[in-house]
Regions:
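Multi-pass alpha-helical transmembrane bundle typical of ion/small-solute transporters
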Residues: 1-208
Length: 208
């Protein structure tokens, strides 16, 4: 399989997932004159939408970045990429769940936040695993052209997410808004410049 085909498939999954988020924003059904208050009451929906949109968008940008280091697509890379896409495609569901129950209080609020936090944790771990495979699998990545210090810097950047997403799992048991806030901070972190310019290196037409 060519790298271009793999990227096109991945881009399609990202595009669908990020589009599905907006479909979860409900149109309030209210009496005349009650719409402004009803729209304000939906703030958890907007907050969850913005954070999840940012996360999916930034995952897509960094996915493109790490794919710039691929020289050859093999079966292991295919399955690791599919694993990442599994969690990306799932994000709209826990986003809707969190938005619905963020102010519910008690067990329902914590359960919704926990599902959201776990989804993001597995997504972060999957992305880190994908990068480690590209960086260390002989013949797959072109990272040998980088200085070791550059590889370590990128590894820290792409692997550090999972432990911090896991922190949001603990917060989910206390406060759904706090859980969402941690994910928002992580989105900002990964949106910041880092890692330098990315180029597609090597012959990307080779495949399994």
């Amino acid at each position: 399989m060519s790298l271009g085909r793999l990227e096109a498939f991945s881009d399609g999954v990202f595009a669908i997932a990020i589009t599905l988020l907006v479909l979860e924003i409900p149109v309030p059904s209210v009496e005349h004159g009650e719409l402004p208050d009803a729209l304000l009451d939906q703030w958890p929906v907007y907050a969850a939408y913005v954070v999840s949109f940012a996360i999916i968008g930034i995952i897509w940008i960094n996915h493109h970045a790490v794919f710039g280091y691929i020289e050859r697509v093999d079966r292991g890379l295919l399955f690791l990429n599919l694993n990442l896409l599994l969690w990306v495609a799932l994000i709209p569901w826990p986003t809707s769940l969190l938005a619905e129950y963020m102010q519910a209080g008690g067990t329902d609020e914590r359960a919704a936040a926990l599902v959201y936090a776990l989804t993001m944790t597995f997504m972060g771990a999957s992305f880190g695993g994908l990068w480690l495979y590209i960086a260390h699998r002989p013949g797959v990545g072109a990272v040998s052209r980088l200085q070791p210090v550059e590889v370590r810097a990128r590894t820290r950047r792409f692997v550090i997410g999972a432990p911090f997403y896991a922190l949001s799992v603990g917060l989910a048991l206390v406060s759904a808004p706090a859980c969402l806030a941690v994910n928002a901070v992580l989105a900002v972190y990964y949106a910041l410049p880092g890692g330098g310019a990315i180029e597609h290196l090597g012959d990307t037409s080779k495949g399994v």
